[in-house]
Regions:
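Hydrophobic regular secondary-structure detector
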Residues: 1-111, 275-649, 653, 665-666
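Short glycine/threonine-rich beta-strand-turn micro-motifs
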Residues: 88-92, 182-194, 288-291, 680, ...
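Short acidic/polar micro-motifs at solvent-exposed secondary-structure junctions
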Residues: 91-92, 146, 184-189, 195, ...
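A short glycine-centered flexible hinge/capping loop motif at secondary-structure junctions
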Residues: 196-197, 582, 733
Length: 733
């Protein structure tokens, strides 16, 4: 095979150029991400049962939906939560590799079968099925420089204008409005209702009947009478818009012509649709959008599309509101930085390899031959990644960095052996190359097979570990196989055409720096040879040292801490604020002000968005979350300015707040695997002992975990049972 390309160097160049061309075209098509898509596909069902307790939501909504989710293909597990705010959430996790669109369709079909058994109010308020991870890709906050603009006004603009625009971006799983728009609020007066013998249901019926769109048809519509001269659309009643229109709704009328209007029994005002969640940007009222990534979508491309859409919409913001867009939490810059750093390391590795080759070969032509093979093999590897549907991520790039040293070895072996044959047998470069390839072709293939046998098994790992290392394995194996291919095609052709017989004689005659280096290297080689001879002469002592080294390695392996992936400074932090059960929103807001005051004083913090009422385990008045955007890494290069150090200091300092527990933490190392750094543990009532016993077991487990010195920040992400006021209805009265 090698002789064929030695005699046809142009054909070897054509193959190399085709490999480079295919790889170069593939680079622009490959997605960029920090890690392979490790998180399994998830589908989330959300429902709202306004006014219901957590127990009622669980019995009449959550369990009904859970019981229907049977027979779903590749469903791994399912979790659900019910809150006293009347919300229910069911998360279904599927096996890795499942098509998220198919999973969502199957869940939607199952949900339709359960809808008839759900309360009417749940059906009317709607059930949503979304595919995506539970954590946020980014948080986009809108704030105003005009102090008269309220968070409700901003939230109403987001709901009416921005929400649909961003939801339609490819790769966006869900857009959650962290604020509220306008709604007409009707405050009933019980005394007046009793005076006019009215019930709240009468008010609801009147509103449903009169707050409607009426289709009145057309004037002169076909078939028309003979001589009809005008055709026009008739507009009648439309939906009510102002408080005055609602006040004039007739809620009761009598035969004598007397009517009771809504304003006679209630106070009508324009207010916020919901007061459950309130957002603040750097302590000022705002509204935000929490954008979640769809399962299988690429974070970088989706993030760029969102930013482009926001930039496109900014000129159309209402001028009187003076709105400004702030991306207060963004997970994509760290991904871009990670890829850039790995690409930088790849470039540095290439330069160092070329310099080291020149240092030892001391021949520009001989150095140039292995250097040419590097871009050919690397670009070809990108083509293989595209063929397998992989991405450019830190693991595939790390595999390429590691492969550089391996792939130049093949070319160096060929070049060195050709020079040796030319020097020892006084052959021409062409003949020396032919003879050299006859000698080492089998060795090149053998080396490739041995190295492949080391890395190929990693491609067959199961679970998340397999997903992580499969791309690493395929990348490094494909680079090595391409390296052998190039070493048997292009490298011999280059040796036969570029090397000169005179170059093989110059190595021993070098002077200057290279002469000094050669003499120093020869002395080092002599000392090494004498050392090896000494080891051979004292085998017992050498074997003892070898055993001690093995023992030291084993001890080090056992004692080193282990983790799935290391926690890195992603340029962002999260905080969970939890108040005692039953605490009101005013108490939560007071704690949030203390939290904001502390965090905004920290020199590492750039922006802070705080959201009261939003919790990791559910929404309630006594919980809140915050997302902290840190300054660029170049501005936090000092000691103690890393994200982990900032989080530890903040958690310690804010522990003095007696009315709340505050935990500041880093985002999860891998998107979609948890809501924060560390790991989650869930307890399951397999014995059916009941809710109270399960809560008691949870508290006992947390206390035991806090005593473990290897654990930090042990906490409950769920909401405790809220106080309930039971009303007993006397049906006779």
């Amino acid at each position: 095979m090698a002789r064929f390309f030695i005699d046809r160097p142009i054909f070897a160049w054509v193959i190399a150029i085709c490999i480079m061309f295919a790889g170069g075209l593939s680079i622009s098509q490959l997605p960029l991400e920090q890690y392979p898509n490790i998180a399994p596909p998830t589908v989330k069902i959300s429902a709202t049962y306004t006014g219901a307790s957590a127990k009622t939501v669980e019995d009449s909504v959550t369990q009904v939906i859970e019981q229907q989710m049977k027979g779903l293909d590749r469903l791994t597990y399912m979790s659900a939560s019910s809150s006293s705010a009347g919300s229910a959430s069911i998360n279904l996790t599927f096996a890795a590799g499942t098509d998220p669109d198919v999973a969502q369709m199957q869940v939607q079909n199952k949900l339709q079968q359960a809808e008839s058994r759900l309360p009417q109010s749940v059906q009317s308020e709607g059930l949503t099925v979304t595919k995506g991870s539970s954590d946020f890709l980014m948080l986009v906050a809108l704030a105003s420089d005009n102090e008269s603009v309220t968070g409700t006004q901003i939230g109403d603009y987001i709901s009416s204008t921005l929400l649909d625009q961003l939801s339609r971006i490819d790769g966006v799983g869900d857009v959650q409005t962290l604020g509220s728009g306008y709604a007409m609020r009707i405050w009933l007066d019980p005394a007046r209702l009793e005076k006019y013998a009215l019930m709240p249901s009468d008010i609801s019926s009147a509103l449903e009947a009169q707050n409607t769109e009426v289709s009145a048809g057309q004037l002169g519509a076909l078939p028309a009478v003979t001589g009809q001269q005008l055709n026009a659309t008739i507009s009648a009643r439309s939906k009510l818009q102002t408080p005055e229109q609602f006040e004039n709704v007739v809620v009761k009328s009598s035969s004598d012509g007397a009517v009771v209007l809504l304003r006679d029994v209630a106070r009508v005002e324009l207010g916020s649709e919901s007061y459950d969640i309130n957002s603040a940007l750097n302590g000022r009222p705002a509204a935000a959008m929490g954008i979640q990534l769809a399962s299988g979508a690429n974070a970088l491309s989706v993030g760029e599309a969102i930013k482009a859409k926001l930039k496109e919409l900014e000129p159309f913001y209402p001028t009187q509101m003076q709105l400004k867009t702030v991306i207060a939490y963004d997970t994509t810059p760290f991904v871009s930085l990670s890829i850039k750093e790995v690409v930088k390391s790849l470039g540095e590795a290439i330069v160092l390899v070329v310099l080291i080759m020149f240092l030892f070969m001391q021949n520009l032509r001989a150095t140039l031959i292995p250097a040419i093979t590097v871009p050919v093999v690397l670009l070809g590897t990108f083509g293989v990644l595209a063929l397998f549907g992989y991405s450019i991520n830190t693991l595939t790039m790390f595999a390429m960095v590691l492969a550089i040293g391996l792939l130049v070895d093949d070319a160096i072996v060929v070049v060195e052996n050709v020079e040796r044959v030319m020097s020892e047998e006084q052959l021409s470069p062409l003949e020396a190359t032919r003879k050299s390839m006859d000698e080492i072709t089998s060795a090149l293939i053998g080396i490739a097979l041995v190295l492949s046998a080391v890395f190929i098994p990693m491609a067959f790992f199961s679970g998340s570990t397999g997903i992580i290392y499969r791309q690493f394995s395929v990348t490094i194996v494909s680079a090595m196989l391409l390296s052998v291919l190039v070493a048997m095609t292009l490298t011999p052709a280059l040796c036969a055409t570029m090397l000169k017989a005179s170059d093989a004689q110059l190595h021993a005659q070098r002077g200057g720096f290279f002469g000094w280096f050669n003499r120093s290297f020869d002395r080092s080689a002599d000392r090494y040879q004498r050392g090896v001879s000494g080891v051979i002469n004292h085998r017992g002592r050498a074997l003892l040292v070898y055993v001690l080294v093995l023992v030291a390695m084993a001890v080090g392996y056992v004692s080193l801490p282990t983790s799935f992936l290391p926690d890195e400074d992603q340029g962002a932090l999260m905080a969970q604020i939890q108040l005692p059960v039953g605490a009101t929103d005013s108490r939560t807001q007071a704690v949030m002000r203390q939290f904001e005051t502390y965090m905004l004083k920290q020199p590492e913090v750039e922006a802070l968005i705080s959201i009261s009422g939003l919790g990791m385990g559910g929404n309630s008045q006594n919980t809140a979350r915050a997302f902290i955007k840190l300054k660029d890494w170049s501005e936090r290069s000092g000691k103690g300015q890393g994200a982990a150090q900032v989080a530890q200091r903040a958690t310690l300092a804010l522990s003095s707040i007696g009315d709340a527990s505050v935990f500041v933490m880093q985002p999860p190392a891998v998107r979609g695997l948890g809501q924060s750094s560390g790991f989650d543990v869930q307890l399951k009532d397999l014995g059916g002992v009941g809710h109270e016993a399960l809560v008691a077991a949870r508290e006992q487990f947390i206390e035991l975990a806090k005593k473990d010195p290897s654990l930090l920040g042990v906490r409950s992400n769920g909401l405790d049972d809220t106080p309930q006021l039971k009303v007993t209805i006397d049906d006779r009265k």
